[in-house]
């Protein structure tokens, strides 16, 4: 389907969980002939990342309102009004056929500005519980989409757009068929690392000894400390790295993953077809718990909340999973995945753009 001459503005910023799914949809539509611009903030990751993907970006000034002091709270209406004005000027200049909100602070003023300009707004909620901005914008959006059931009562469940190299991994029954020896445990802390993983897993390695082999991604600045912890535990045979550049290769290597349960991580693990032990980040909305719950309910994962995440608890879970169990869990994870999430979101964007009056001309 050709999108020749159609214009999309993607609103997403702050974290990879918002930006990467937006980029996946943007590239998919650009391949169909769409023009794409981005709306973001100049001091967050999208400012560097989006232009590297060949997409022009416009900036507005906005930041989060949660947990700020009284002066910031009092000035919030003025700052939001100014951000909406900035976004509206950008919308009028670019004249998109449709706007896609993928989350982050920028989506609020951007979505309101689009609505004021009569431009259809499509929202995508990546997490199992809706963020404040998306909850608010859902009342004015043309279409609301969600990655996991439950964020919105009536929204279509379309999954999270996931990287193509992860989607291309062989099915679990092919990948895991002839494996033997120690169970391969991939520990992923993300770019900043996860202290609870870095502190607990060396002890788990000592407890389970030669029954497991670990590849532990520790995050920025934690390499020497965690290497020392494994050494002190008499476990020098494991692979400890600060970052993992090729996550698809790491997933292909692993029999099981131990990690946080950010929205994209959960979606990637399901797409890869991997069993998981999740330790959700302790957030007051319990966002990561709700992200992980569908996989636990499907029998593909186990959740251990951070206060209970101990050497004994983790060792007990991992030692209870033999290769037969892990293969069944991997197949259940793959069954929960929505591999065509990018295409589903792109189709809804196209439909919303098509619903706009065809006589609207670009300036």
Curated annotation (Swiss-Prot):
Pfam families: Glyco_tran_28_C, Glyco_transf_28
Swiss-Prot/TrEMBL catalytic activity: di-trans,octa-cis-undecaprenyl diphospho-N-acetyl-alpha-D-muramoyl-L-alanyl-D-glutamyl-meso-2,6-diaminopimeloyl-D-alanyl-D-alanine + UDP-N-acetyl-alpha-D-glucosamine = di-trans,octa-cis-undecaprenyl diphospho-[N-acetyl-alpha-D-glucosaminyl-(1->4)]-N-acetyl-alpha-D-muramoyl-L-alanyl-D-glutamyl-meso-2,6-diaminopimeloyl-D-alanyl-D-alanine + UDP + H(+)
Membrane association type: Peripheral membrane protein
Protein EC: 2.4.1.227
This protein's UniProt keywords: Cell cycle, Cell division, Cell inner membrane, Cell membrane, Cell shape, Cell wall biogenesis/degradation, Glycosyltransferase, Membrane, Peptidoglycan synthesis, Transferase
Principal localisation: membrane
InterPro entries referenced in this protein's UniProt entry, alphabetically: GlcNAc_MurG (IPR006009), Glyco_trans_28_C (IPR007235), GlycoTrans_28_N (IPR004276)
GO cellular component annotations of the record: plasma membrane
Binding site for UDP-N-acetyl-alpha-D-glucosamine: 15-17, 127, 163, 191, 244, 263-268, 288
GO MF entry, a single one: undecaprenyldiphospho-muramoylpentapeptide beta-N-acetylglucosaminyltransferase activity
CDD domains, alphabetized: GT28_MurG (cd03785)
Residue stretches spanning the membrane: none
Pathway: Cell wall biogenesis; peptidoglycan biosynthesis
Broad EC category: transferase
UniProt-annotated location(s): Cell inner membrane
SUPFAM superfamilies, per database record: UDP-Glycosyltransferase/glycogen phosphorylase (SSF53756)
PANTHER family attached to this UniProt entry: GLYCOSYLTRANSFERASE, UDP-N-ACETYLGLUCOSAMINE--N-ACETYLMURAMYL-(PENTAPEPTIDE) PYROPHOSPHORYL-UNDECAPRENOL N-ACETYLGLUCOSAMINE TRANSFERASE 1
Function: Cell wall formation. Catalyzes the transfer of a GlcNAc subunit on undecaprenyl-pyrophosphoryl-MurNAc-pentapeptide (lipid intermediate I) to form undecaprenyl-pyrophosphoryl-MurNAc-(pentapeptide)GlcNAc (lipid intermediate II).
Name of the protein in question: UDP-N-acetylglucosamine--N-acetylmuramyl-(pentapeptide) pyrophosphoryl-undecaprenol N-acetylglucosamine transferase
Source organism (scientific name): Pectobacterium atrosepticum (strain SCRI 1043 / ATCC BAA-672) (Erwinia carotovora subsp. atroseptica)
Top-level taxonomy: Bacteria, Pseudomonadati, Pseudomonadota, Gammaproteobacteria, Enterobacterales
